[in-house]
Amino acid sequence: MIQSGIGHLRAIQMRSVASEVVYKRLGGEPLAVRAVVGRTVFRSTDADGIWTRVETRDFIVPKEQLPFEPQVGDEVEFLGATYEVLAPNGEPAWRWSDAFHTAYRIHAKHTGG
């Protein structure tokens, strides 16, 4: 029941709040997908006790729209700006957006445009 509810909500999300983005795999062809745009704040402490805060632009893309796992170095174009997929502070470059693995939450940083 929860899984079907998540599927239903994901469909509403894609119709209502998702934006068109272009995903470019490193060395691959551009792929137009719909993504919900968000952010994640990562915090860590280095060996000297200094706090680091990194904020990423996140793109939540349904798994069926992206036929491969996102990789560090891939790029996302959104509203004329380019974002590079990255792994901040040793974190993974992406996470599953939910417990049923229906969408990638891809972490990226603005690099130009």
Positions of PLM-derived features:
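Active-site-proximal polar cores
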Residues: 1-25, 29
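Short, conserved turn/kink motifs that form compact alpha/beta structural patches or helix kinks used as
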Residues: 25-113
